[in-house]
Amino acid sequence: MTGIAAASFFSNTCRFGGCGLHFPTLADLIEHIEDNHIDTDPRVLEKQELQQPTYVALSYINRFMTDAARREQESLKKKIQPKLSLTLSSSVSRGNVSTPPRHSSGSLTPPVTPPITPSSSFRSSTPTGSEYDEEEVDYEESDSDESWTTESAISSEAILSSMCMNGGEEKPFACPVPGCKKRYKNVNGIKYHAKNGHRTQIRVRKPFKCRCGKSYKTAQGLRHHTINFHPPVSAEIIRKMQQ
């Protein structure tokens, strides 16, 4: 092996015929060389042996990646893939997904998802949504802006409910916000879009309203407000006021 050939292995760069491809590991480089630059045809090997009877490269005899090793590697990849999918799904349900870079938007129409209302089972923990049932329309129109707040992210439940389970779908993760046609290939893309794409568009109802006009998203918030700003008046104070 020449010095240049040896150096190519240390740099993980293929030097065969000016190929120049770079690989992350030595194993990947060797596999590339065996697949693309070394002949495995028995007739070619026999011809080379006849031409050079005193020397035959070991690469033709002892392959680094044998057929058995390749089959084992493919089998291992198939076993790892379902576990990776389960890990991603679990990460979405917990909402623990790191912020990824932005992705380009898709052109497919997102599936129709049911409207997210204050009566949803996850309203108290992750309130989201921008559309409500028809029977609430009259109340919404007469309500003031004080009864609304903005939400900076879409819940994991909403993302999972809009996920396309078709295995052939290139971008299965669709934005659940009605009218948004954004689709993404992975969980990180849709989570980043959900966190930043509709920061000022999503309005969430604050259904717990005080007689003074203030509204709150939870009963605990309304109770805290009442205790601090509208404390109960004792019977003794009422009698003194009537005197």
From Swiss-Prot:
Q: What is the effect of changing residue 69 to P?
A: Little effect on interaction with NR2C2
Q: GO MF annotations for this entry?
A: transcription corepressor activity; zinc ion binding
* Cellular compartments annotated: Nucleus
Q: Per its UniProt record, what PROSITE patterns does this chain match?
A: ZINC_FINGER_C2H2_1
Just give the chief location class: nucleus
What's an example GO cellular component term for this entry? Answer: fibrillar center
> Which SUPFAM superfamilies does the record cross-reference, listed alphabetically?
beta-beta-alpha zinc fingers
UniProt biased composition (Polar residues): 89-108
Q: Name one GO biological process term.
A: negative regulation of transcription by RNA polymerase II
User: Could you tell me where the Low complexity compositional bias lies?
Assistant: 118-130
Zinc finger feature spans (C2H2-type): 12-37, 173-198, 208-230
Where Phosphothreonine occurs, residue numbers?
109, 113
InterPro entries in alphabetical order: ZnF-Chromatin_assoc, Znf_C2H2_sf, Znf_C2H2_type
Site positions (Breakpoint for translocation to form JAZF1-SUZ12 oncogene) are: 129-130
Outline the segment boundaries, as ranges, of region: Disordered.
89-151
Keywords for this protein: Chromosomal rearrangement, Lipid metabolism, Metal-binding, Nucleus, Phosphoprotein, Proto-oncogene, Repeat, Transcription, Transcription regulation, Zinc, Zinc-finger
Region (Required for interaction with NR2C2) spans which residues?
39-79
Q: Which residues form a coiled coil?
A: none
- From which domain of life does this come? Eukaryota
Q: Where is the composition biased (Acidic residues)?
A: 131-148
Oligomeric form and interacting partners:
Interacts with NR2C2 (via ligand-binding region).
Q: Which disease is it linked to?
A: A chromosomal aberration involving JAZF1 may be a cause of endometrial stromal tumors. Translocation t(7;17)(p15;q21) with SUZ12. The translocation generates the JAZF1-SUZ12 oncogene consisting of the N-terminus part of JAZF1 and the C-terminus part of SUZ12. It is frequently found in all cases of endometrial stromal tumors, except in endometrial stromal sarcomas, where it is rarer. Translocation t(6;7)(p21;p22) with PHF1.
More details: Under hypoxic conditions, the precursor SUZ12 RNA undergoes regulated trans-splicing with the JAZF1 RNA, resulting in a chimeric isoform which may be protective against apoptosis. The chimeric transcript is characterized by JAZF1 exons 1-3 joined to SUZ12 exon 2-16. The chimeric transcript is expressed primarily in the endometrium from late secretory and early proliferative phases of the menstrual cycle, but not in normal myometrium at any phase of the cycle. Its expression is slightly induced by low levels of progesterone, but suppressed by both estrogen and high levels of progesterone.
Kindly give the PANTHER family that the UniProt entry links to this protein.
JUXTAPOSED WITH ANOTHER ZINC FINGER PROTEIN 1
Function of this protein? Answer: Acts as a transcriptional corepressor of orphan nuclear receptor NR2C2. Inhibits expression of the gluconeogenesis enzyme PCK2 through inhibition of NR2C2 activity. Also involved in transcriptional activation of NAMPT by promoting expression of PPARA and PPARD. Plays a role in lipid metabolism by suppressing lipogenesis, increasing lipolysis and decreasing lipid accumulation in adipose tissue. Plays a role in glucose homeostasis by improving glucose metabolism and insulin sensitivity.
Name it.
Juxtaposed with another zinc finger protein 1
What gene, per UniProt, encodes this protein?
Answer: JAZF1
